[in-house]
Amino acid sequence: MRTLWMALCALSRLWPGAQAGCAEAGRCCPGRDPACFARGWRLDRVYGTCFCDQACRFTGDCCFDYDRACPARPCFVGEWSPWSGCADQCKPTTRVRRRSVQQEPQNGGAPCPPLEERAGCLEYSTPQGQDCGHTYVPAFITTSAFNKERTRQATSPHWSTHTEDAGYCMEFKTESLTPHCALENWPLTRWMQYLREGYTVCVDCQPPAMNSVSLRCSGDGLDSDGNQTLHWQAIGNPRCQGTWKKVRRVDQCSCPAVHSFIFI
């Protein structure tokens, strides 16, 4: 049977009225195209109208030379561009990178991969160099008792004697917190139990948590107008977290010890 099929194909090339399929007709079409046909042998060994469109694979009416005349070619893309800057300054937004198509897919070849990627982004300064963006950074806090163990001498050589002591205190009113805070009972994490909704707490900003350039601590909420909900997270248990609102900035903290914390 195979010999007969090969013989018929050979005879079709000698028949004056016969075309050899897609190659001789010069046809290769994407998708389903009823006008993309030729005269010749089909893959199902029937002579007559055969097709050279991509859908012929599913309908079974391709010309016998479709695979050779119309090989599948995958999509090729170029390299990623560099990441763009943040779409906006001083607030959470996105950055983007793109790549272009070097060769479109043909004849059922692999489709193109994503041509654009986005990622979260937050810039901490304006184009003019003004410090910003701290409102959206969670405040990482721990008990003020940790300050007794932490040296006040910053490691950066840029710190002067004047800036070593240039700290400040932020007062916040707690709005919400997760139940995980109350579950802590280890000696070094028991301080989390004293975080309560509705209480005013003090958080001290001191070196080395204080940035040596901006002289601020991340997440201090200093730019907030007092109505904005800010986020905090306890160091030692990432599931102990919550929200608060800024009350004011003061030079020295004056809250009870159990409601006194420090920025990390």
Curated annotation (Swiss-Prot):
One CC-aspect GO term: extracellular region
Lineage: Eukaryota, Metazoa, Chordata, Craniata, Vertebrata
A Pfam family the protein falls into: SBSPON_C
PROSITE patterns, per the entry: SMB_1, SMB_2, TSP1
Cysteine-cysteine disulfides: C28-C36, C28-C52, C36-C70, C50-C52, C50-C63, C56-C62, C63-C70
Protein keywords: Disulfide bond, Extracellular matrix, Glycoprotein, Secreted, Signal
Family the entry assigns: Belongs to the thrombospondin family.
Residue ranges of every copy of the SMB domain listed in the record: 24-75
Natural source organism: Homo sapiens (Human)
Tissues in which the protein is found: Detected in aorta extracellular matrix (at protein level).
Annotated signal peptide: 1-20
Protein name: Somatomedin-B and thrombospondin type-1 domain-containing protein
UniProt xrefs under InterPro entries: SBSPO (IPR039942), SBSPON_C (IPR056801), Somatomedin_B-like_dom_sf (IPR036024), Somatomedin_B_dom (IPR001212), TSP1_rpt (IPR000884), TSP1_rpt_sf (IPR036383), TSP1_spondin_dom (IPR044004)
SUPFAM superfamilies, alphabetized: Somatomedin B domain (SSF90188), TSP-1 type 1 repeat (SSF82895)
Domain of life: Eukaryota
Subcellular location: Secreted, Extracellular space, Extracellular matrix
Coiled coil: none
Carbohydrate-modified residues: N227
Ranges of residues in domain TSP type-1: 74-127
Gene symbol of the encoding locus: SBSPON
